[in-house]
Amino acid sequence: MDTSLFSLFVPILVFVFIALFKKSKKPKHVKAPAPSGAWPIIGHLHLLSGKEQLLYRTLGKMADQYGPAMSLRLGSSETFVVSSFEVAKDCFTVNDKALASRPITAAAKHMGYDCAVFGFAPYSAFWREMRKIATLELLSNRRLQMLKHVRVSEISMVMQDLYSLWVKKGGSEPVMVDLKSWLEDMSLNMMVRMVAGKRYFGGGSLSPEDAEEARQCRKGVANFFHLVGIFTVSDAFPKLGWFDFQGHEKEMKQTGRELDVILERWIENHRQQRKVSGTKHNDSDFVDVMLSLAEQGKFSHLQHDAITSIKSTCLALILGGSETSPSTLTWAISLLLNNKDMLKKAQDEIDIHVGRDRNVEDSDIENLVYIQAIIKETLRLYPAGPLLGHREAIEDCTVAGYNVRRGTRMLVNVWKIQRDPRVYMEPNEFRPERFITGEAKEFDVRGQNFELMPFGSGRRSCPGSSLAMQVLHLGLARFLQSFDVKTVMDMPVDMTESPGLTIPKATPLEILISPRLKEGLYV
């Protein structure tokens, strides 16, 4: 009898044990902690509102209270906020593909050819193909070497124009310049030449038509960055997209049309030139490359038509290269002016390794370790994309033990991560030496060290990081070699930041410059 009871209960006990074991192995849908104060319908939106609010700083303060992974409800969408390098590593390694998409936003629709600009495009075959083409045909090391003359000549032209201004003003006393605007024109010139073979600013006069195009291009790029950083109701509440409460979408559509006119003109001019040259034309710039690919039918299988593919990819490159480099150089020079001993150290390094009888060249940069450290430290303190770009989960995944559902948006607070006191001593101080002999001497900026990733990491990292670093290194070295620089009455530089997609300096960088080299080196 006992044996019969035992044989009856054993299978039942085994079944119960297996069921309990399976239940314990099921993934727990643990949600990241959410800040208190969420309101019905709008969620946490009111905590992030404010015209002059710096979102990366606000989110950084929240992270101090709620931890390195937070969940915010912004209208009808969930947003997962990352604020530590450990959580970022989890996102950009094991979960990189799951988090590789972009959300559809009003800015991307109205100004980005219905999300075709690859920096804002959702994860798709189209995004992969456009990114690959841009990388191979403009941003690869081979192509950058071929286009080196464009970068070098534009940097040289700025030095020449600044010197000419000094001569024009009398050639004896330091002359005041708004350096920020000069650097912005230099970067826009550089990208427009690489993409479309045109030059807008400095070095001679333009036809009235080109002068107006230059003005519209500068205005369009500025408006794009302003509008893409603005909150629109439809981004938080897609069902209300039909009603433009704030008028921002109207502005976006207008900016999109203005930029489209310029891009259309570039393409048409290239088509006419190709007709004239017949089969003898060469792919001298990116528009030519894209037209050749279109003629070969390379875009026929993709989501967008050939012309949209060309326009959107050209726009992506112009936007990516024209804003970030001048912003970083502006911050670097501002930091040096507020730390004059470091400014002198940088100029002394150039004088020792290069001298004053020739201009700094690319080949000199490897010996200018302090210049390299200054750029790294500037990118650490003022990353051009402090929150990288919004990502969106294309499938359910687990990040740092928290469940992230499909459709959840993600923000990575690089600004906060790169000021982590566990990693950096005196994290809010400007100390380039930390990248030479200090705690960060092994860190690189290419996305392999998650403690320092100003260009992002993983599939969505910036494909133009090599070009950016070349411009930053040579641009800073040439400027510091060419000019002595100081502020008016030796006053500290105002380091106030302005809201936006990047970290714009709120005020102009008005400085006094005077030449350090002999006249022949500016010509």
UniProtKB/Swiss-Prot annotation:
Recorded GO MF terms: heme binding; indole-3-carbonyl nitrile 4-hydroxylase activity; iron ion binding; monooxygenase activity
Superkingdom in the source lineage: Eukaryota
TM spans (from-to): 1-21
Record GO biological process: cellular response to hypoxia; defense response
GO cellular component terms listed in the entry, alphabetical order: membrane
Keywords assigned: Heme, Iron, Membrane, Metal-binding, Monooxygenase, Oxidoreductase, Transmembrane, Transmembrane helix
Pfam family, one: p450
Catalytic activity: xanthotoxin + reduced [NADPH--hemoprotein reductase] + O2 = 5-hydroxyxanthotoxin + oxidized [NADPH--hemoprotein reductase] + H2O + 2 H(+); indole-3-carbonyl nitrile + reduced [NADPH--hemoprotein reductase] + O2 = 4-hydroxy-indole-3-carbonyl nitrile + oxidized [NADPH--hemoprotein reductase] + H2O + H(+)
Protein name according to UniProt: Xanthotoxin 5-hydroxylase CYP82C2
Organism of derivation: Arabidopsis thaliana (Mouse-ear cress)
Lineage: Eukaryota, Viridiplantae, Streptophyta, Embryophyta, Tracheophyta
